[in-house]
């Protein structure tokens, strides 16, 4: 901002928030916030549409509502008779219900069999629906993914889904702001997934509670859009309401030509507006945290929350070293569930299943990363590779990545959420260990009794070809 500009310096978050306040909050009432984009899937939307029917309401802005199917969809191909091999009747009913709701209320749906169908937080950006400066909501925890574009994006509950459908607005209290400055440069073999796991390990699962995180610094600027989406995707795992990254030329180049993005002179005008979004010099955050990644290694979780992560060369921590009784009890409980011993190296830990996919790491760049490790090798454990969307799957097949996975012995599946949350039949057996590129390692997340170790696609692929936790840097030259 210029020295003569009378406006106060503002953060990226404040600029987007201020532009969408319909009615300011008071001590008694939340702000009324306008929503630019409402993304939907089959699991959290049925009750919301039922509410509309009961009250005789219409969807206020179907043109700002976009739906897909992902959580309940099978990742196996169609049966010879053309039917989809749903895991159970509930999954099939959920998909059928959103198809009916979309027809009845005029909502655009990209469902099973559609070439654009995919995991909601992968397919939305691919469609160009997510753009800088927007407010974006979805009935899904990892809506923060879209903050990578300089949007304010957050998950909402089912009742709020109904509220947005009916009014295109939400009642919201303004969160506080938290800057996560990432200094240094990521070393070869270290990825955005390793970075966000390290950040969460540093601040804890409650470190961002009540805040919107803005990721800044040279290491963030050096990330691709895919890496930025991975970073923002897991902001919620650090307790944040949302995660954001200021848009720049990387953002604009990624968006150019996408279906829903303005074209020609209109795109140039949009970029000019978007360039005004980054945080002003002198703007103040409520909190600031600095992370130095110059010596960061590939990360892997060992416990039952995403903050319980260590370098792949590290050892399982000893609960006895924890001075805080609550933290000690949490760690003891995690190690009991995971059946891991304090002081044991995580390298060499036996793995039963590997999962590459999800809204965290199911994009083309992620699949390339995994293929680079698997190329010319054979997997030693069951490995599922699930593209985040049909567009990603098609692009991966055009590059021959599917052949690399198949020749290695991995299963090349249809797009969907898959083993991220074990809702569609892709799940662990009790006691199995899975190195997963997803975002949550809670007890039973990937199936009752399943044990999840979160990691990057490269680390997951290294585990697949080793049959145990392995350092991907040792398997890839350069």
Curated annotation (Swiss-Prot):
Domain of life, per lineage: Bacteria
Uppermost EC category: lyase
InterPro entries xrefs: 3-IsopropMal_deHydase_lsu, Acnase/IPM_dHydase_lsu_aba_1/3, Acoase/IPM_deHydtase_lsu_aba, Aconitase_4Fe-4S_BS, Aconitase_4Fe-4S_dom, IPM_dehydratase_rel_enz, IPMI_cat
EC numbers, comma separated: 4.2.1.33
Coiled coil feature spans: none
Catalytic function, reaction form: (2R,3S)-3-isopropylmalate = (2S)-2-isopropylmalate
Keyword Metal-binding applies: yes
Cofactor remark: Binds 1 [4Fe-4S] cluster per subunit.
GO MF, any single term: 3-isopropylmalate dehydratase activity
Keywords: 4Fe-4S, Amino-acid biosynthesis, Branched-chain amino acid biosynthesis, Iron, Iron-sulfur, Leucine biosynthesis, Lyase, Metal-binding
Residues that bind [4Fe-4S] cluster: 359, 417, 420
Gene3D superfamilies documented for this protein: Aconitase, domain 3 (3.30.499.10)
Cofactor(s) annotated in UniProt: [4Fe-4S] cluster
Pathway(s) of this molecule: Amino-acid biosynthesis; L-leucine biosynthesis; L-leucine from 3-methyl-2-oxobutanoate: step 2/4
BP term (GO), one: L-leucine biosynthetic process
Pfam families: Aconitase
NCBIfam families listed in its UniProt record: leuC, PRK05478.1, PRK12466.1
Homology family: Belongs to the aconitase/IPM isomerase family. LeuC type 1 subfamily.
Subunit structure, interactors included: Heterodimer of LeuC and LeuD.
Job of this protein: Catalyzes the isomerization between 2-isopropylmalate and 3-isopropylmalate, via the formation of 2-isopropylmaleate.
Record-given protein name: 3-isopropylmalate dehydratase large subunit
Organism name: Anaeromyxobacter sp. (strain Fw109-5)
Gene: leuC
């Amino acid at each position: 901002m210029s020295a003569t500009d009378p406006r106060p310096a503002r953060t990226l978050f404040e600029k987007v928030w201020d532009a969408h306040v319909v009615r300011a909050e008071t001590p008694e009432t939340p702000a009324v916030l306008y929503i630019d984009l409402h993304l939907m899937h089959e699991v959290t939307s049925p009750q919301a549409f039922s509410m509309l029917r009961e009250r005789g309401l219409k969807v206020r802005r179907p043109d700002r509502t976009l739906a897909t199917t992902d959580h309940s969809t099978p990742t196996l191909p169609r049966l010879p008779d053309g039917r989809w091999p749903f895991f159970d009747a509930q999954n099939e009913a959920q998909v059928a219900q959103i198809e009916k709701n979309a027809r009845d209320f005029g909502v655009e749906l990209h469902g099973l069999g559609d070439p654009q169908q995919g995991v909601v937080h992968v397919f939305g950006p691919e469609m160009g629906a997510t753009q800088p400066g927007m407010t974006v909501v979805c009935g899904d925890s990892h809506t923060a993914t879209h903050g990578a574009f300089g949007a304010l994006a957050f998950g909402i509950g089912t009742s709020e889904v109904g509220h947005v459908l009916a009014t295109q607005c939400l009642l919201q209290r303004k969160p506080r702001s938290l800057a996560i400055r990432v200094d240094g440069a990521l070393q070869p073999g270290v990825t955005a997934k390793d970075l966000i796991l390290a950040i969460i390990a540093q601040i804890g699962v409650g470190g961002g509670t009540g805040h919107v995180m803005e990721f800044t610094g040279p290491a963030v600027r050096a990330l691709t859009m895919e890496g930025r989406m991975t970073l923002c995707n897991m902001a919620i795992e650090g307790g944040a309401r949302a995660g954001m990254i200021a848009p720049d030329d990387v953002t604009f180049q990624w968006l150019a030509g996408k279906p829903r993005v303005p074209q020609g002179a209109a795109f140039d005008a949009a970029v000019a507006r978007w360039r005004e979004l980054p945080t002003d010099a002198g703007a103040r955050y409520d909190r600031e945290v600095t992370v130095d990644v110059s010596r960061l290694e590939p990360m892997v979780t060992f416990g039952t929350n995403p903050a319980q992560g260590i370098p792949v060369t590290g050892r399982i921590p000893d609960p006895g070293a924890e001075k805080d009784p609550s933290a000690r009890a949490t760690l003891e409980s995690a190690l009991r569930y995971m059946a891991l011993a304090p002081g044991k190296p995580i390298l060499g830990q036996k793995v039963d299943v590997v999962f590459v996919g999800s809204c965290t790491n199911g994009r083309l760049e992620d699949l390339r990363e995994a293929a680079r490790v698997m190329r010319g090798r054979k997997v030693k454990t069951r490995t599922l590779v699930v593209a985040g969307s049909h567009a990603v799957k098609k692009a991966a097949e055009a590059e021959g990545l599917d052949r690399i996975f198949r020749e290695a012995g991995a299963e090349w599946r249809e797009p969907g959420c898959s083993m991220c949350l074990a809702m569609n039949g892709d799940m662990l057996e009790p006691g199995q260990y899975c190195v997963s590129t997803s975002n949550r390692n809670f007890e039973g997340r990937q199936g009752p009794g399943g044990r999840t170790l979160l990691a990057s696609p490269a680390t997951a692929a290294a585990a697949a070809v080793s049959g145990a936790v392995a350092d991907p840097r040792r398997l890839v030259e350069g």
